[in-house]
Regions:
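Hydrophobic alpha-helical segments within soluble ligand-binding/sensing domains
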Residues: 55-82, 97, 122-130, 148, ...
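Flexible loop/turn connectors
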Residues: 131-238
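Alpha-helical recognition/docking segments in bacterial nutrient-uptake
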Residues: 7, 13-70, 74, 128-135, ...
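An alpha-beta-alpha
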Residues: 68-106, 212, 216-229
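Alpha-helical structural signal in soluble globular domains
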Residues: 34, 94-106, 150-158
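Short beta-strand elements in bilobed, periplasmic/extracellular small-molecule ligand-binding domains
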Residues: 7, 100-123
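Short acidic capping loops at alpha-helix termini that bridge into adjacent secondary structure
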Residues: 78-79, 110-114, 161-168
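Short beta-strand/turn micro-motifs composed of small residues
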Residues: 46, 58, 84, 117, ...
């Protein structure tokens, strides 16, 4: 979907309709490109295309996911499953790539059935969880906040205890009472959502002011926090 910001031309900085593209499921660059008038100021938010025509602000989760898999393996977990978003999205592809690399480097069994895909919407994680639980996963990584909250609730309903019966790594990208309640029982990958929004806002204003500015790619990094570490401790690659 698109976030569109319209503002009347009250100053030279705002003569345009400016466009944010955030969390879109569009995978065809040509379709997207056809919608954009020439000279229109655009910043892609947490999405990239192979064709680098537009500036972008995104979050890299490669290292936090890689570290989380290695930590789980170090604890003795052997069957580590992962639930990603739509497979065609650039963010999903990076996260699954990090998982695959860590599984290989840690000498864990490479089982394609341990990789499941949701759609990052409500009620999309349960079917994935059923598949992973059927395959006796002893740890699960959930790559999106809403699906992670759904996972916590679903496991609780099944009587499966976090940090005892199964290890969980949760993405945190919005304020959630469910996450707050169980944060000390699972690893977390904290998304810099405020920094992402601020960076996107600053960059779109710059493009409005200087439409011919060079194309840029601003990459932020999420923060990995193991659950048995103090809340003040965290690791980020920023």
């Amino acid at each position: 979907y698109f976030f569109v910001w319209r503002r009347p031309p009250i100053s030279p900085l705002f003569p345009y309709t400016t466009l944010f593209r955030s969390a879109s499921t569009m995978d065809d660059f040509q379709r997207f490109d056809a919608l954009i008038p020439a000279g229109f100021p655009v910043v892609l938010v947490d999405r990239i295309f192979e064709t680098k025509k537009y500036s972008s602000v995104c979050v890299s989760n490669f290292q936090p996911i890689y570290r989380s898999v290695c930590r789980l393996a170090g604890k003795g977990d052997q069957r580590i499953g992962i639930i990603g978003g739509l497979p065609r999205l650039s963010s999903t592809q990076e996260r699954i790539s990090a998982y695959r690399q860590a599984v290989a480097d840690c000498g864990l069994p490479e089982d394609e059935h341990l990789i499941q895909y949701g759609d990052s919407l409500e009620n999309s994680a349960c079917a994935c969880l059923d598949q992973l639980l059927e395959r006796k996963c002893d740890a699960i990584i959930v790559c999106q906040g809403l699906m992670a909250s759904e996972t916590i609730i679903y496991l609780h309903q099944k009587g499966i205890q976090l940090a005892q019966d199964i290890d969980l790594v949760s993405f945190v990208d919005y304020d959630s009472d469910v996450y707050a309640l169980y944060a000390n029982q699972m690893d977390s990958i904290i998304q810099p959502v405020e920094d992402l929004g601020q960076a996107a806002g600053e960059q779109i204003l710059r493009r409005v002011e200087v439409p011919d500015a060079p194309i840029f790619e601003n990459v932020l990094t999420s923060t990995y926090r193991p659950y048995n570490q103090p809340r003040a401790w965290s690791h980020s690659d920023r």
